[in-house]
Amino acid sequence: MLLSWSIVFAEAQDRYFGRTYTSNVLPKGNFDIELWHTSRFGHANQYFHAMDQRVEYEVGLGSNVQTAFYYNRFQKSYSDSSNAISQTTEFGFSNEWKWRVSQPASKVGVALYGEIGIRGDELEFETKLILDKSFGKNLVAFNAVYELEAEAERENGKNKFEMANTPVELDLAVMHNFCTSFGAGLEILDHNDISNGTWNNSVLYLGPTINYRGNRWFFIANYLPQLSNVHKTTAFPGKQVVDEHERTEARILIGFSF
């Protein structure tokens, strides 16, 4: 029984959690189409609701490598000083690559991940170290994430990129699979804002995730309230960070395999 569950983890879909990635990759020639919707809401003294939406095409290339292409839409609704509601919308494109170094079936699964994204006048680079391990019907995953955010600016008649923000995030997730089609667990995220080498805050999120799946599809839902700012600074002295981050995030993913 333990071996059969390890095989399920190793060979099935590559996504189990709403936020945390696993080391699985699609077999060569297989591809997924995924629809993402993330709502972020709750700012201090302000109405705020952001919707991040993605359409993803993901394909296995063989040799433990897969790639994916995303079309992204970002919309924000927020109240201004006069309590009027304003809205902004941006579009973007992303390309990710994942290389599985080892599988979680008999030892710790290890994968390396890289993503480049374009959004308005911003260019983003993201890397992940992915670790996971299956224990019978349980799956544990850990991600260490580093980002580099570059923003285009024009100064003195010249174009330049401002690369001040380098956030770091640590993600930990655990899921128990009650049967081959349903699992439930928890995810915890520690997001650290770093700018110009200064560690500004450390925002902790914790919430449940469910995964419901069939042979050719899956549905994932994640609810993630902000718990606390565990690294208080002069710039961010509060118990929570609710100006640059939101009180609550919720995500739904629907995927189809071919």
Regions found by a protein language model. Give the residues of each.
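Transmembrane beta-barrel domains of Gram-negative outer membranes and organellar outer membranes
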Residues: A12-S257
